[in-house]
Amino acid sequence: MSDVKKMFINGQWVEALSGETRESINPANGEVLAAVAEGSAADVDKAVEAAKEAFYNGPWGSTPAQERAALLFKLADLVDANAGELAELEMRDNGKPLRETKYDVADTAACFRYYAGLCTKPMGQTYEVADPMQAMTVREPIGVVGLIVPWNYPLLMATWKIAPALAAGNCIIFKPAELTPLSAVRLFELIEAAGFPKGSANLVMGAGASVGARMAEHPEIEKIAFTGGTETGRKIMMAATGNLKKISLELGGKSPCVVFEDADMDAAVDWALFAIFANQGQVCSAGSRLLLQESIHDEFVEKLVARAKQIKVAPGDAEGVEMAAMISEAHMEKVLKYIEIGKEEGATLLCGGERLTDGELGKGFFVAPTIFTDTTPDMRIVQEEIFGPVLAVQKFTDDEDAVRLANDSIYGLAGGVFSENGTRAMKFIKKLRAGITWINCYHPTYSEAPWGGYKQSGIGRDLGTYGFDEYTEVKQININLEPGPVGWFEG
């Protein structure tokens, strides 16, 4: 085991004030990868003081947009230069296949470049108002912002928040997930190497119950951005009321993947597998509910199950691996419990449903691709987010029935539809209560387009210009072009 991985506060690598550490584990084999500093509320307070100084009195608050852009472009170049190392690190810390982490790293660099380019684009507006006045708006950074991300896409989710926050001119306190801190440590080493001023970017590691809670309630953190579970999002929302801080929340999902009878069946089968089993189903937008028109249900399920049984489950660096380890033993047990719940509720288990322990898989936390049919809308496996490789298949009769079933959820993050009839597909999408939608595909995501959901899937948006705006305040400026007395009072 290497030396303790430290936190980054005010341009310095520091241990936790308490001296506590936590081990980071490779979920594929249980190997201890590193010990990392385990911060607390006191470390958050220290980071906030550094961020305040950098924003209000230091160089970052007055750094021109062109210089912010140059630093972000340099950071993107450093990510590219260290892509192999970052992908390997992410694979070992998170457990996902190496080919997935390579995509994540490439997307990370692209996201930094997108927001670097956005820094210098027009942000304000002017308004035609009555003479002799001129009215305009400008966008300004919020100030000190807190960023909290989950463990399923540690590096990429970090970038989705860090890039726009810094591009807009804010100072950040960033908290990675407790289970996957290592790529964040490496990213902050690259932030330091790129030359960002001290205090502009701060890394505090630790538990959500201590570090995350303090960030949410801290009176001098002016915005909190969080990606994670809906219950945690509720707690953050309540804690943020103390100083009425701005919040953006990207939360849970139970997203539908809908296939009409006129779809290209083989293509839809392929996408449906990708929708639920990519990243072991540990995706907030996973297509965990598969809605099939009843006329194609049996044939589609037969093809789907046959393909699912062929998925190669192995450690992330194995040759030809298609699905890898779950993030932790505790999460694996949660997923396995949901599988048992599905059986008890009366759903039919067609494949998977078990922990895989053959050979080297016995050292890690692996679950077979799992498919249930004969489900009903009231079942927990249909309504609750499992966050694993578990698919619930439902039948629908016609377009109206498909819309009804698809929207029968407290969540509204994402959804996809498959049909060769473009009018039918578009009509369905317009009625789907979800923030991210796809037609004849599932999961494509772009830095340029907003990401976020309806209902209990969150508030606000990541990515695109919408994601940038989340980290800004709008200031109205009014100019009198003919200065003189107002003439309101006669005396």
Question: Could you tell me what each predicted segment is?
Answer:
Residues 1-28, 54:
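Hydrophobic face of amphipathic alpha-helices that form TPR/SEL1-like repeat modules
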Residues 29-35, 221, 258, 312, ...:
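Conserved C-terminal structural/oligomerization subdomain of aldehyde/semialdehyde dehydrogenase
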Residues 30, 68, 90, 112, ...:
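Residue-level signal for inorganic ion chemistry
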Residues 31-122:
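Glycine-rich loop-to-alpha-helix module at the N-terminal edge of alpha/beta enzyme cores
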Residues 55, 59, 76-83, 87, ...:
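Structural signal for hydrophobic packing residues in well-ordered secondary-structure cores
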Residues 124-267, 396:
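Rossmann-like NAD(P) dinucleotide-binding subdomain of oxidoreductase/dehydrogenase enzymes
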Residues 171-173, 349, 436:
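A short hydrophobic/small-residue beta-strand
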Residues 231-376, 439, 486-489:
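ALDH superfamily catalytic-core signature
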